[in-house]
Every structure is written in C-alpha cells, then in structure tokens.
Amino acid sequence: MGDRVTVGIVGASGYGGVQLVRLLLEHPKVDIVYLGGEGSAGRPYTELYPHLQGRVNLTVEPVSVEVIRDRAQVVFLSLPNGIACQLAPQLLEQGCKVLDLSADYRFQDLQTYTQWYGEPREDQATAQKAVYGLPELYRDRIRQSALIGCPGCYPTASLLALAPLMKQGLIEPNTAIIDAKSGTSGGGRQGKINLLLAEADNSLAPYNVARHRHTPEIEAICSDLAGQSVLVQFTPHLVPMPRGILATVYATLRDPGLVREDLITIYQAFYRHSPWVNILPPGLYPQTKWAWGTNACFIGIEVDERTGRVIVMSAIDNLMKGQASQAVQCLNLMMGWPETMGLPQVAFYP
C-alpha cells in the first residue's frame, strides 16, 4: 500500500475518536484524511477539541461511503452500537479495511448480539468474516483480516486476566467472578446525570448488575479459549476518575497445589510475545495510573491457599488499551508493522 496509509475516522467527535486522532497524528506510517460524523458535520475539528489547534486542519464531514472510499484505505468506526454494521459491509465492498470500535462485530453469533443489544441483524456473512481484535489472543488472525471487531474495555481487562487460566485449564471455568471498576469516560462524552461531577464525585457505585452487555462478550471468548461453554459473573462499578479500569478476577483452581510463583511463571510464558502485557513480580499489584495514556496492561497475581482460589488483577486505560490504542495495535498487525508502532510506551506520572 505504499509508504504511508490513508486513514478515515467515522465518529471522530467522541472520546474514542479523539484518542484515535491523537494517536494517529503521531503514527509514522499514517495520514488522517477524513473525519466523519453526523451531529458535528460542518464544524472544524478544533472547534470540538481546541487543544488540537495547529495540529488538525480538518473539518468534520457528513458520513459518505463514496467520499471515504476515494480518500481512505483504512477506516476506524467509532460509532454507537447498531450503526457500524450498516457501514462496514459497504466499506469492505469498496476495498477498505475496517476497524469497528463498537460491539457490532465482536460476536460470531448474531443471535447473542440481538439478545443483549436489542438490534436485529441481517449481515451474518459479514460478521463471520470479522476477527475479534484482542491481539494477545488472536494476533495471527488479525494479520489476515480486513474487518476487526475491537473488544470492549471491560472485556479487554478481564480477558487478559483470564486467558491463561482458561486456555490451559487451570481453573474450574464456571467459577470465574469479575469485579471491575472504570472511570467515567467509559460512559462517553454525551451528558448523563450519573456522570456529572456532583453525582459521581466522592462516590463508588455498581451498575447494570447481572445484565451488563459486556458479559456475553467475555463469555464467548472464554468459551473459545476453554473449548467448552463458559459462564462468568461480571459486575462493573463506576469510579470518580476520568479514565482507567481495574478488573479483579476470582476463580477456583483445579489444582489446589498451584502457588503464586507457579502462576506468575505460567503468565510470563503465555504473554512472552506480548509487549504490552506486564506480569508483575510477587506481591506487587497493578494500579490504573500506571497505564494512563498507554496501551499497557499490568497484571498482578495472588493465590489464596485457604480458599483454593486464584486472584488476578488487571489494570488498563479504558480509552487506550480498552479502546483506541488497541485498535491502532490491530492496525499495525493488519499492515505488517511492529505492533508497538506509534503507541505511547510510558504513562503520565503522577
């Protein structure tokens, strides 16, 4: 595709979109040539995000498959659920590579999608072509695909914590409990009462208990890894901070003789080719601040010998590894570039 790749972003006005813009501006192999969105069409992008003055000279345009086709080789879709599935088939037909940040192409079984998201779908053939965009698990498939269904933020943190346990049969698979906490940016940029400072500050609250839409996504990938149907218990919480996810996973070990050091060695081996996953040494547990602004995931491991359970803690930036930078990581793989290319390596600290 030549030395540089032209990229369009549809849904550029949201938090996911602006993270993509920030990352792709610094990417050595990419040129942003199109920013699309219906609600903000006609407005200079710097009117939406003034901090990008002098860096972005594009105006947000109405969404047009023909315009995108003529300009962009790769398209990121950062749209609400149920919209990407209307655009992706058309873009693929025009020869574009597509990375979808919504839930539309995370499921091979569209009945599951319809059950949890309430949207009937008629694009089963397209969904079958999609690859789940978690590079640490599906790196080789991503390299060969033209359509990536990028994971949700909670599933990313949860699955990176669970994958070695599920894949290697180290736990009773249906005993997994995920307690996850996310910053307020996970709710998007549109005004919501529970995300107002007066509502969210100095408070910690669970939400969508036993019915969060990321549950079937986690279960589908766990089932694939375990080679059997898996159910998980997943409870998300809202934390009064702008970004970050900490997922704490509990599960019963099949071999109660496994100790913490054994599991750390297993995790290090499992992720030995994954530059963004950091397995912490014994007694050190992850903090969300360590991942701020990066594509990193920090994983800490503990074993409670008294209960026979393993406890795995996983910290990511929900807008980065949980959304935009993971999509860019997938782009790197699709194009045959190093998967670290153009992505921040070190967090802002403190």
Curated annotation (Swiss-Prot):
InterPro entries: AGPR_AS, AGPR_type-1, NAD(P)-bd_dom_sf, NAGSA_dehydrogenase, Semialdehyde_DH_NAD-bd. It is found in: Cytoplasm. SUPFAM superfamilies: Glyceraldehyde-3-phosphate dehydrogenase-like, C-terminal domain, NAD(P)-binding Rossmann-fold domains. Transmembrane segments: none annotated. GO terms for molecular function: N-acetyl-gamma-glutamyl-phosphate reductase activity; NAD binding; NADP+ binding. Pathway: Amino-acid biosynthesis; L-arginine biosynthesis; N(2)-acetyl-L-ornithine from L-glutamate: step 3/4. It comes from the Bacteria. The keyword Lipid biosynthesis does not apply. It catalyses: N-acetyl-L-glutamate 5-semialdehyde + phosphate + NADP(+) = N-acetyl-L-glutamyl 5-phosphate + NADPH + H(+). GO terms for cellular component: cytoplasm. One of its GO terms (biological process) is L-arginine biosynthetic process. The active site is at 153. Its EC number is 1.2.1.38. It is an enzyme of class 1 (oxidoreductase). Keywords: Amino-acid biosynthesis, Arginine biosynthesis, Cytoplasm, NADP, Oxidoreductase. Belongs to the NAGSA dehydrogenase family. Type 1 subfamily. Catalyzes the NADPH-dependent reduction of N-acetyl-5-glutamyl phosphate to yield N-acetyl-L-glutamate 5-semialdehyde. NCBIfam families: argC. This is N-acetyl-gamma-glutamyl-phosphate reductase.
